[in-house]
């Protein structure tokens, strides 16, 4: 069965792609969940128009993302956290913390775009990727320091 994807599906392809899937998978999963539609001639024509506008929109978004990369690559974030033995943090620095501090500096970045595999639990300097567009990734320098304690 041929279907046209309405959403990006990691195992199949991107939105607007025409893919062959098993009949049961298409009929029982993709179509009822509105993740795809049948690949008829009329639907193919509509998708071609949508693809053309999506290409223009994607090119514009990519250009904006590339401008943002230059700005983000110059950003250095500093977090101070309480530290225990062996420079291990009490707590951690998460993608939400990074996105929040970027927001305070005037960048509107969703926390899900911060590609942090796991929260930072050590002191040091880290280069954290931020995925701005499907093809564009910026890197933000994050420094985690131990909090100064008054003795």
UniProtKB/Swiss-Prot annotation:
GO cellular component, one term: ribonucleoprotein complex
Pfam assignment, any one: Ribosomal_L9_N
Keyword DNA damage: no
Gene3D superfamilies referenced in this protein's UniProt entry, alphabetically: Ribosomal protein L9, C-terminal domain (3.10.430.100), Ribosomal protein L9, N-terminal domain (3.40.5.10)
Family annotation (PROSITE patterns): RIBOSOMAL_L9
Record SUPFAM superfamilies: L9 N-domain-like, Ribosomal protein L9 C-domain
GO BP, one annotated term: translation
One function term, GO molecular function aspect: structural constituent of ribosome
Keyword Transcription on entry: no
NCBIfam families hit by this protein: L9
Function summary: Binds to the 23S rRNA.
Protein family according to the UniProt entry: Belongs to the bacterial ribosomal protein bL9 family.
UniProt name for this protein: Large ribosomal subunit protein bL9
